[in-house]
A protein has these predicted regions:
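Sec-dependent signal peptide recognition
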Residues: 2-10, 14
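A residue-level marker of the well-folded mature domains of exported/periplasmic proteins
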Residues: 3-5, 21-126
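C-terminal segment of classical bacterial N-terminal signal peptides
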Residues: 13-22
Length: 126
């Protein structure tokens, strides 16, 4: 949970600072599972708690079936179309999400991967 709090705080600080009565930022967590799994239920709670701490409007987009990469890709593309301020996602395929991540970055939407080792990074770098 501490990593998620730091992650969201970092995303929030990346944007201009102003005061508003409603949530200033919208973040989506696009995951490859649902929250029926105890691990992802804990991640969901941590994500929600972190969002509450930075007063962000956050959604965790889960799948109707565990591991459905096409549904996950649709959720990622939907997040981009919504113009969210940042996306956290798991990358479960080496190439299927590349175009969507590139599209998000081109639109100025930061994308952070979670629970995913980068093939060019150190093992356990997630």
């Amino acid at each position: 949970m501490k990593k998620i709090t730091i992650l969201l705080a970092s995303l929030a600080m990346a944007f201009s600072v102003s005061t508003a009565s409603k949530a200033e930022y919208k973040f989506n967590f696009v995951m490859h599972s649902d929250t029926n799994n105890a691990f992802w239920a804990a991640v969901h709670k941590g994500f929600k708690d972190a969002c509450d701490q930075v007063d962000a409007d956050c959604q965790m987009l889960t799948l109707s079936g565990d591991g459905d990469q096409q549904e996950q890709l649709q959720n990622l593309e939907s997040s981009i179309a919504q113009g969210v301020d940042g996306i956290v996602t798991t990358i479960t395929h080496p190439t299927i999400f590349d175009a969507a991540v590139d599209e998000a970055l081109a639109a100025g939407i930061p994308v952070i991967t979670a629970n995913t080792d980068h093939p060019g990074g150190a093992t356990g770098s997630n």
